């Protein structure tokens, strides 16, 4: 058992690191906006740079993971990733903040691809499903990052101090686990670019489900703290509670998701997930108090936790399109929504209200419940 747990710990450390740094950033968004006096629309453009950095990194890191080995790439990315979170706190001007966000997004996307590739190797080595446990570790990291942000704001810690301390501490605690012994599979690519395929009708509907989930997750990450601060009127420290509750709920649901799918089936779990997300967003939109709105974010977390894993599993089982291309096609919907969704919300929030923005996200969440039958395998 110890022999099997050793590689698991290494991958889990990579997921934890990714989640902690994203949660750390998300929890201090209102502070960064206030420091630079940035309007929501302008900040949406900055968030777009973060997402674009991640999207650009996906194909690059995928090829590097194949040619160099996923574990080696994860180790190579770890230090620049830690440096990038520190740079976000130290950036003195908006242009430098934009550059730091783009680099932070690239490091986040690169680490995401590398540790998922590494996780698939370890899962095969262990001989049983463990992927959900790794994604749960990402959510644990996000909760820890958000909790750190809450503590930092309570004690009025400057953003640059908070981010620097986080980078040094997390690097020291998790770095050794990334160095645990593991030999990744090395693959060679044939000449020519690896392209995506246009999804068939079934995969297109799966893609819409992934889009709805990606939009919800991206909105919670980038705008939950702003919503609580600006709409509900909470203190900056309490604004971190929304994403903390969202992430904590995702942890618990992801730890249970595999057993629920075995018992009820993919479609039923997806349908219940969609209803949970819709109800949670209604609480957020209609709620006027901190406990009620945080409860809404918790239900959002429960609702979105299992959706993307179910969508990718359905894509991999497609009878027409090969698994790799099918997953890549569906991933474009999810990551495109995570990238463009927060940007669009920033623009819409300037023209309308944040409540309307979240209501629209809820309409997309309803698609998950409606389209759930397409996830049957």
Curated annotation (Swiss-Prot):
SUPFAM superfamilies documented for this protein: MFS general substrate transporter
Gene Ontology terms: cellular component: plasma membrane
GO molecular function, one term: transmembrane transporter activity
Keyword list, A-Z: Cell membrane, Membrane, Plasmid, Transmembrane, Transmembrane helix, Transport
Membrane topology according to the record: Multi-pass membrane protein
Keyword presence, Transmembrane helix: yes
Domain of life from the UniProt record: Bacteria
Keyword Transport in record: yes
Localisation per UniProt entry: Cell membrane
Cystine connections: none
InterPro entries from the UniProt entry: MFS (IPR011701), MFS_dom (IPR020846), MFS_trans_sf (IPR036259), MFS_Transporter (IPR051788)
Regions crossing the membrane: 4-24, 41-61, 85-105, 134-154, 159-179, 192-212, 278-298, 301-321, 327-347, 356-376
Family named by the database record: To R.meliloti MosC.
General function of this protein: Could be involved in a transport system.
Protein name per the record: Uncharacterized transporter y4wD
Native organism taxonomy: Bacteria, Pseudomonadati, Pseudomonadota, Alphaproteobacteria, Hyphomicrobiales
